[in-house]
Amino acid sequence: MIMSTSTVTLSTPIKTHNGDVSTIVLKEPKARSFFEHGEPFKMRVINEGERDRVEFDYNHKILAKFLTDMCGIDDMLLGGMSASDYFLVRNAATNLIVGVAGTDPLPA
């Protein structure tokens, strides 16, 4: 099995123990993250006639632990990201968790 990854380029680098980081590579999480941390979000499918849409209700404390598991950067350091960069990373992580993005995304 090939593990999916997603790379996010930050608009502002974050400071880590190994220097400034301007890209974050997220790896598909393992089941262990769910066992140890719980659910990072709840997903609701909302029927709107012919089209459905999906809403996410995030638990940001749990998602921070997932991000650490997925990229190897401590959540305290990830907390130094700008809000806009966090939203990019959060969206990339969400797509990896639900299986719709990465190096080998599922067919549409």
How would you describe each model-predicted region?
Residues I2-A108:
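Short, surface-exposed, charged amphipathic helix/loop patches that serve as local interaction elements
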